[in-house]
């Protein structure tokens, strides 16, 4: 016997009197706290799509699942010294500026190098830079910039350098246990709400420390307490995995980034790319790696080929060819992007 088709369930009818009371309550809340203080998730005004700023690395944008660093969220980049944390942040600043965005750098370490930033594509003349004297001043500047709603990306370099005022005013050797953690916890409680209402990317750079007496598990931890781990929507762990040499000369590092936390897409994905000294992320090197991975460029031994055309022997020679041949470079880049986004290739 054929089963009878069950009639499609209609949504329950809400009592008009209750609906009227609800609408009055929503109007009152919007008058008191502004439009968007409360909304139905199905309304057009409720933003469902995550807006992003590119990291400057196609592989990392893909690993993040949404195409870049999410706007209106807190992101943390951490790793050992000289692993590429600031380089990655400067690339994100450059990408924001390329699209007409405003970028700010809160340089708590007082170590910003404008010459290097310019080489990575950062517009130094348009970049807002602050070198605060204390952690409270730095986080107050961040809050003001976020609440302005005019800044696209704010980078704080770094959490470890956000020294509380009480520590600065004290003597060397004074006990300051938990001061920075309390400062970060208080600041992030205030900041996250403001950031979510803005379209800013708030990017904290953090350092690693070793926990004493850890026998099992990783002894590594980040500075500034647990608040940043909790409030971050995205956490990126960046590490050097190999050195890049040109003959005997050291020219860069092979870098691996792991997405250890992601609230906007599935986490635990990884991306690998080259960071070259004085140049930053090697866009051509990454393009070749992704093209080989997706089978767009074929690799046989040391030889690389595209279709029936031999590109050259060795990765460095292929990079030189792609640098000179703009048409071929753009064709391969578009095919790689299509593979990353799932679009059909031509």
UniProtKB/Swiss-Prot annotation:
<dbReference type="InterPro" id="IPR013765">
    <property type="entry name" value="DNA_recomb/repair_RecA"/>
</dbReference>
<keyword id="KW-0227">DNA damage</keyword>
<keyword id="KW-0233">DNA recombination</keyword>
<dbReference type="Pfam" id="PF21096">
    <property type="entry name" value="RecA_C"/>
</dbReference>
<dbReference type="InterPro" id="IPR020587">
    <property type="entry name" value="RecA_monomer-monomer_interface"/>
</dbReference>
<dbReference type="InterPro" id="IPR049261">
    <property type="entry name" value="RecA-like_C"/>
</dbReference>
<dbReference type="InterPro" id="IPR027417">
    <property type="entry name" value="P-loop_NTPase"/>
</dbReference>
<dbReference type="GO" id="GO:0016887">
    <property type="term" value="F:ATP hydrolysis activity"/>
</dbReference>
<dbReference type="GO" id="GO:0140664">
    <property type="term" value="F:ATP-dependent DNA damage sensor activity"/>
</dbReference>
<dbReference type="GO" id="GO:0005829">
    <property type="term" value="C:cytosol"/>
</dbReference>
<feature type="binding site">
    <location>
        <begin position="79"/>
        <end position="86"/>
    </location>
    <ligand>
        <name>ATP</name>
    </ligand>
</feature>
<keyword id="KW-0238">DNA-binding</keyword>
<dbReference type="GO" id="GO:0009432">
    <property type="term" value="P:SOS response"/>
</dbReference>
<dbReference type="InterPro" id="IPR020584">
    <property type="entry name" value="DNA_recomb/repair_RecA_CS"/>
</dbReference>
<dbReference type="InterPro" id="IPR020588">
    <property type="entry name" value="RecA_ATP-bd"/>
</dbReference>
<keyword id="KW-0234">DNA repair</keyword>
<dbReference type="GO" id="GO:0006310">
    <property type="term" value="P:DNA recombination"/>
</dbReference>
<keyword id="KW-0963">Cytoplasm</keyword>
<dbReference type="GO" id="GO:0006281">
    <property type="term" value="P:DNA repair"/>
</dbReference>
<keyword id="KW-0067">ATP-binding</keyword>
<comment type="similarity">
    <text>Belongs to the RecA family.</text>
</comment>
<dbReference type="InterPro" id="IPR003593">
    <property type="entry name" value="AAA+_ATPase"/>
</dbReference>
<dbReference type="GO" id="GO:0003697">
    <property type="term" value="F:single-stranded DNA binding"/>
</dbReference>
<keyword id="KW-0742">SOS response</keyword>
<dbReference type="InterPro" id="IPR023400">
    <property type="entry name" value="RecA_C_sf"/>
</dbReference>
<dbReference type="Pfam" id="PF00154">
    <property type="entry name" value="RecA"/>
</dbReference>
<dbReference type="GO" id="GO:0003684">
    <property type="term" value="F:damaged DNA binding"/>
</dbReference>
<dbReference type="GO" id="GO:0005524">
    <property type="term" value="F:ATP binding"/>
</dbReference>
<protein>
    <recommendedName>
        <fullName>Protein RecA</fullName>
    </recommendedName>
</protein>
<keyword id="KW-0547">Nucleotide-binding</keyword>
<dbReference type="InterPro" id="IPR049428">
    <property type="entry name" value="RecA-like_N"/>
</dbReference>
<comment type="function">
    <text>Can catalyze the hydrolysis of ATP in the presence of single-stranded DNA, the ATP-dependent uptake of single-stranded DNA by duplex DNA, and the ATP-dependent hybridization of homologous single-stranded DNAs. It interacts with LexA causing its activation and leading to its autocatalytic cleavage.</text>
</comment>
């Amino acid at each position: 016997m054929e089963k009878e088709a069950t009639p499609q369930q209609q949504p329950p009818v809400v009592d008009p009197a209750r609906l009227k009371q609800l609408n009055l309550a929503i109007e009152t809340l919007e008058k008191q706290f502004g439009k968007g203080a409360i909304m139905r998730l199905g309304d057009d005004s409720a933003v469902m799509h995550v807006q992003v700023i590119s990291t400057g690395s196609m592989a990392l944008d893909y690993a993040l699942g949404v195409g870049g660093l999410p706007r209106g969220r807190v992101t943390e980049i951490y790793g050992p010294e000289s692993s590429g944390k600031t380089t990655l942040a400067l690339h994100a600043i450059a990408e924001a500026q390329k699209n007409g965005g405003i970028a700010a750098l809160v340089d708590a370490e007082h170590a910003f190098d404008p010459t290097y930033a310019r080489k990575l594509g950062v517009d130094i003349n348009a970049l807002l830079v602050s070198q605060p004297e204390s952690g409270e001043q730095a986080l107050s500047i961040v809050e003001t910039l976020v609440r302005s709603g005019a800044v696209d990306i704010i980078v704080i370099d770094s959490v470890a350098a956000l020294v509380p005022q009480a520590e600065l005013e004290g003597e060397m050797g004074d006990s300051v246990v938990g001061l920075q953690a309390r400062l970060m916890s208080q600041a992030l409680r205030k900041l996250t709400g403001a950031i979510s209402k803005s379209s800013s990317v708030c990017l904290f750079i953090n350092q690693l420390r070793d926990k004493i007496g850890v026998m099992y598990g990783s002894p590594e931890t980040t500075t500034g307490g647990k608040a940043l781990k909790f409030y971050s929507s995205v956490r990126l762990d960046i590490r050097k995995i190999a050195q890049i040499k040109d003959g005997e000369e050291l020219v860069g590092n092979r870098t691996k980034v792991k997405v250890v936390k992601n609230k906007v897409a599935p986490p635990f994905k990884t991306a690998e790319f080259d960071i070259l000294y004085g140049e930053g992320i090697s866009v051509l090197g990454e393009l070749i790696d992704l093209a080989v991975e997706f089978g767009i460029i074929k690799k046989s031994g040391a030889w690389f080929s595209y279709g029936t055309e031999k590109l050259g022997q060795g990765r460095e020679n292929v990079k030189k060819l792609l640098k000179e041949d703009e048409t071929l470079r753009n064709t391969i880049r578009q095919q790689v992007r299509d593979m990353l986004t799932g679009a059909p290739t031509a």
